[in-house]
Structure formats: C-alpha cells, structure tokens
Amino acid sequence: MWQPATERLQHFQTMLKSKLNVLTLKKEPIPAVLFHEPEAIELCTTTPLMKARTHSGCKVTYLGKVSTTGMQFLSGCTEKPVIELWKKHTLAREDVFPANALLEIRPFQVWLHHLDHKGEATVHMDTFQVARIAYCTADHNVSPNIFAWVYREINDDLSYQMDCHAVQCESKLEAKKLAHAMMEAFKKTFHSMKSDGRIHRSSSSEEASQELESDDG
C-alpha cells in the first residue's frame, strides 16, 4: 500500500530505533574498534610510515674497489689491492677519514649504505650477493682497521670480473666483527644452497665451501 514520504520516513526511523534498542540489550561486548574515533584510526595507520628508516650496521669509510686477477684466493690475496686503494685515499685526503658509509651484513646479502654530509643514510646503496663473495679478511699490514672482500661482478655481457672492495673501520675490533659476521652469512648461504639442491655432489660442496672462505686473521 502506498504511503506518503513522511509516513515512510517515520516508519523507517521507528524500525531503526527498535534495532538499536535490541543491540544495546545484548550482553556480548561490542568490538572495541567501533568505539575508535576516525582520527585515532588514521593516526595508527599512518604514523609508522612517517618514521625515518633506520639501518643496523657498522659505520665505515669506503675506500673503493679495484679489479684483481686469479681464481685461487688465499691468505694475503687482498694485501696488494688494499695497498693500492689505501694509497689513492691517502693522496686525496688526510690521515683521518670521516665515515661515509654504513656496512650491513645480512644472511644472504651485504648492503653498503652511502651516507650524506650529515652522516645519515641516503637512497644510494650498493648490494652484494653473499654467494658471489669469494673471499674476505680483516688482516692487513697497511692497517688493522681495514676489512676487505673479493666480489664476482657480472657485467652486462654476462662476463665477470673479480673486484676487491675495502672499507676502513673505526677500530681493529670492528673489522674483526665484520669478518666474523661475513663468515656467518657464508654458512647460511651455503646451507641454503645445499637445501635448495643447487649443490649436489660432495665434491661440489667442498668447492663451494672453499669459495666462500673467510680469513679473520
């Protein structure tokens, strides 16, 4: 039966009021989210996005990289490249180098965050795959504070070259800590490769373990 608009509106308001009364009589607690104000919900979702990104790692001075030859990386193999990088850096600056990077060793990757003049991490970051690091050490005659690693860099034409990267740490202890952290990353990467089936024979396992070698002195 047709009803005027005012009567339909009154009927709707009466039904809504009765439903609200039923809800208030229920003993089950209403979910707490219903009592949150819109402003509070908005703050909860946006506040974490506004926080500055923090990085855990060791502040270092990145000395650069230099190509190296050979496939067998034994103790002392980074001495010559490190001396070359050290000389280039000492010619350009004083004996005291300000930290310009943050080295972060993760289970399967090494992140080198570049710092700005305020000492804060920038968006520029170099990434190294642990599986392509052939050797690392914190034992150098030119300075006990230097940590270096040999990395297999793959070019655009799929050829590769071995580069020696070096950083100067704040102390000898920090350099040793980086070497030990890298060794732990080696172990996790090796076990992951083995469990994924990328290492099949025992001989291949021995070769992989020799390639992922660390010498912390």
UniProtKB/Swiss-Prot annotation:
It holds the Pfam family PID_2. InterPro entries: PH-like_dom_sf, PID1, PID1_PTB, PTB/PI_dom. Residues 60-217 form the PID domain. The keyword Coiled coil does not apply. PROSITE patterns: PID (PS01179). SMART domains: PTB. This is PTB-containing, cubilin and LRP1-interacting protein. It comes from Mus musculus.
